[in-house]
């Protein structure tokens, strides 16, 4: 699971649009998550009599979802197959082709800006360790008040010297203990409410998609020359690591009190928190203002150390032993995996029999295999390249409505559902690693699916845009990689019975079924509520009261509701009716009913056969009884051998024969 806030952010970003054919309401809510990683499109006038709707659910950071919302519609529109009206082929080409562009260096640089990595480059762990160990030693001799001043984020002489040398291209974050993945959560939070020129993005794009142009504008050039203008997640973290380990326990209390006071005096009452998460070992999460400027100011004036001194010391000790990073914010791992102690088992085998020894050997073998899988998963995640688009990605469910023809392309576990006279028609399939088709592809590509349904212990979905760390098998095409961007395509002709469709991320579908969502929306449409208001009420209904459960109701939530108007029926349709999802479902149901009938017939035949078998068994029983009686008669006939038999023994024998025959 990802990091959670102490209180959910329930403010929503909502829009309502309409034309003569459609009415659309969309909304998104951050919820309990540390940052908002969803994005969406709602483009009514995408093309002539054509609309485009999409929901992108990001993981490992918001940058890929934001970039998709900003660029994917135009990418699709420029394809020759789209221009030729081959929409099904065009959607597949768009997903696979757009996913490939995420490896382009120029695109990666844009993703880095979205992820908050501008002017930050990775370096080897040894370089960081040498610098920080030296600084730790130096800071251990400083007076306490100077250390506390640095915790407050006040500029010191070293900081001024660093700013004077900011023309160096390879500016590095100085602490290996806070290096983590990158501050994707911070970037998503900072850019969530950015405003972009409407001409630079598709109409109807979600507000989170604005970050690309905003970051590439004036700030992009200025930030490349002045790191002080960049949101630096290390503002308070640097000085935290430079405190002597021996002084941590005595300084932590004073630091905490000072931090709380500073927090209360922060601008606009916003909090800016850096939290060390011990389970992910150097993972950095941030929460605070959505405004980039406020984050810059608060990072200088506010810092709350929410990790205990024990947690901090444990992070330092573990960092000295090894370097380890997770693949995304949704991935949790067990840092204390131990190899099974086989020595005691071997010694005990000497006193047990061979069978017990075999059982112990099997148990040890199972444990070793489990540990080997765990180690392989850990190594995969530890060696994952920390770069946007490689260790981050997004699901995508895209709806292209051309006339009355609806094409739905889906990769991942977001979903699209149509309400036809109150009945839910699912227009997408959730792609999960444990599914037979998905698991087969993952294993063929060299991956593993864990018992909790994760690919190599990381992602809990099997198709997505981005995540190129899982797409490195050079012998296989893109659509056959562990994580594939190939979408499933479903088609439908909109009829007068079709009322609306709902696109939403798994934050909704993990809590409510398709039928429940359809009924929820229908009830509120009868009350003439705005579509965006219905989305907001849907979020409130799904929101968990706390984060103590299994994570259901704690995710980001995004939904788009599209209501079909009567005039839409005047438009033409070109999809062959026998290829639409409703017809395929009906055919599938007929086949299912036929199989059920055959099964019932077999059961009926089986019952008759059982009856015949019962009659046959009774007849056999009668024959057996007759044979036994004849044997009894023979036994009762005196013979020379038993004429002198003892009467008592003879009586016992007769009773035994009678009982056996009955």
Curated annotation (Swiss-Prot):
Compositional bias annotation for Polar residues: 238-252, 261-275, 288-319, 337-347, 591-609
E.C. number: 3.1.3.16
SUPFAM superfamilies, per the entry: PP2C-like
Pfam families tied to this protein: PP2C
Acidic residues composition-biased segments: 320-334, 349-374
Protein residues bound to Mn(2+) 1: 57-58
Chain residues that bind Mn(2+) 2: 57, 506, 555
Residue intervals of the PPM-type phosphatase domain: 23-564
Gene Ontology cellular component annotations, sorted alphabetically: cytoplasm
Cofactor note: Binds 2 magnesium or manganese ions per subunit.
Residue list for modification Phosphothreonine: 637
Cofactor(s) needed by this chain: Mg(2+); Mn(2+)
Disordered, as annotated region: 219-275, 288-374, 591-662
GO molecular function, one term: protein serine/threonine phosphatase activity
Top-level lineage group: Eukaryota
Modified residues (Phosphoserine): 289, 306, 592, 594, 599, 639, 641
InterPro entries: PP2C, PP2C_BS, PPM-type-like_dom_sf, PPM-type_phosphatase-like_dom
A GO BP entry: signal transduction
Catalytic function, reaction form: O-phospho-L-seryl-[protein] + H2O = L-seryl-[protein] + phosphate; O-phospho-L-threonyl-[protein] + H2O = L-threonyl-[protein] + phosphate
Family: Belongs to the PP2C family.
Protein name as annotated: Probable protein phosphatase CG10417
Lineage per the UniProt record: Eukaryota, Metazoa, Ecdysozoa, Arthropoda, Hexapoda
């Amino acid at each position: 699971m990802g990091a959670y806030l102490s209180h959910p952010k329930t403010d929503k970003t909502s829009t309502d649009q309409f034309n003569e054919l459609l009415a659309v309401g969309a909304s998104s809510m951050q919820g309990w998550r540390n940052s908002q990683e969803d994005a969406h499109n709602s483009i009514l006038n995408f093309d002539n009599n054509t609309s485009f709707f999409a929901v992108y659910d990001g993981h490992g950071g918001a940058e890929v979802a934001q970039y998709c919302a900003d660029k994917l519609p135009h990418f699709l529109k420029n394809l020759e197959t789209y221009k030729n009206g081959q929409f099904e082929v065009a959607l597949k080409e768009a997903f696979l082709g757009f996913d490939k562009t995420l490896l382009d260096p120029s695109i990666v640089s844009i993703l880095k800006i979205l992820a908050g990595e501008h002017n930050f480059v990775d370096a080897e762990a040894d370089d960081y360790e040498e610098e920080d160990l030296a600084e730790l030693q130096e800071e251990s001799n400083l007076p306490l008040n100077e250390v506390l001043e640095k915790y407050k984020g006040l500029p010191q002489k070293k900081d001024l010297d660093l700013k004077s040398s900011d023309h160096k291209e390879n500016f590095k974050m100085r602490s290996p203990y806070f290096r983590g993945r990158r501050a994707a959560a911070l970037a998503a939070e900072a850019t969530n409410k950015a405003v972009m020129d409407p001409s630079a993005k598709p109409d109807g794009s979600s507000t989170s998609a604005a970050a690309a142009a905003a970051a590439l504008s004036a700030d992009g050039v200025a930030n490349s020359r002045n790191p002080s203008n960049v949101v630096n997640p290390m503002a308070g973290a640097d000085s935290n690591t430079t405190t002597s380990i021996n002084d941590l326990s005595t300084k932590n209390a004073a630091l905490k009190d000072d931090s709380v006071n500073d927090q209360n005096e922060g601008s606009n009452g916003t909090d800016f928190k850096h939290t060390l998460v011990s389970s992910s070992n150097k993972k950095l999460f941030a929460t605070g203002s959505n405004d980039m400027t406020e984050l810059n100011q608060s990072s200088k004036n506010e810092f709350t150390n929410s990790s205990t001194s024990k947690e901090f010391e444990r992070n330092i000790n573990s960092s000295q032993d090894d370097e380890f990073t997770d693949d995304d914010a949704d991935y949790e791992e067990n840092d204390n995996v131990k190899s099974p102690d086989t020595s005691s088992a071997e010694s005990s085998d000497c006193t047990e029999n061979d069978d017990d020894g075999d059982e112990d050997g099997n148990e040890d073998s199972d444990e070793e295999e489990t540990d080997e899988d765990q180690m392989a998963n850990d190594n995969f995640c530890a060696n994952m390249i920390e770069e946007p688009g490689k260790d981050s990605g997004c699901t995508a469910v895209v709806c292209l409505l051309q006339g009355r023809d609806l094409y739905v392309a889906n990769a991942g576990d977001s979903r699209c559902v149509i309400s036809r006279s109150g009945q839910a028609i699912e227009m997408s399939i959730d792609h999960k690693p444990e599914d037979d088709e998905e698991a087969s592809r993952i294993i063929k590509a060299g991956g593993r699916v864990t018992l909790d349904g994760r690919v190599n212990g990381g992602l809990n979905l099997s198709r997505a845009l981005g995540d190129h760390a899982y797409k490195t098998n050079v012998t296989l095409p893109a659509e056959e990689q562990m994580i594939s961007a190939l979408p499933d395509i479903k088609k439908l002709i909109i009829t007068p019975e079709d009322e609306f469709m709902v696109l939403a991320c798994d934050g909704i579908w993990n809590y409510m079924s398709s039928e429940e969502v359809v009924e929820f929306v229908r009830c509120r449409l009868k009350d003439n509520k705005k579509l965006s208001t219905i989305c907001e009420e849907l979020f409130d209904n799904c929101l968990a009261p706390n984060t103590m459960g299994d994570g259901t109701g704690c995710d980001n939530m995004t939904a788009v509701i599209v209501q079909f108007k009567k005039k839409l029926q005047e438009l033409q349709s070109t999809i062959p009716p026998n290829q639409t999802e409703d017809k395929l479902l009906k055919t599938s149901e007929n086949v299912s009913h036929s199989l059920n009938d055959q099964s019932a017939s077999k059961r009926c035949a089986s019952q008759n056969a059982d009856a015949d078998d019962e009659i046959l068994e009774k007849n056999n029983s009668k024959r057996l009884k007759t044979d036994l009686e004849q044997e009894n008669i023979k036994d009762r006939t005196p013979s020379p051998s038993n004429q002198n038999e003892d009467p008592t023994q003879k009586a016992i024998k007769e009773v035994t024969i009678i009982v056996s025959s009955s």
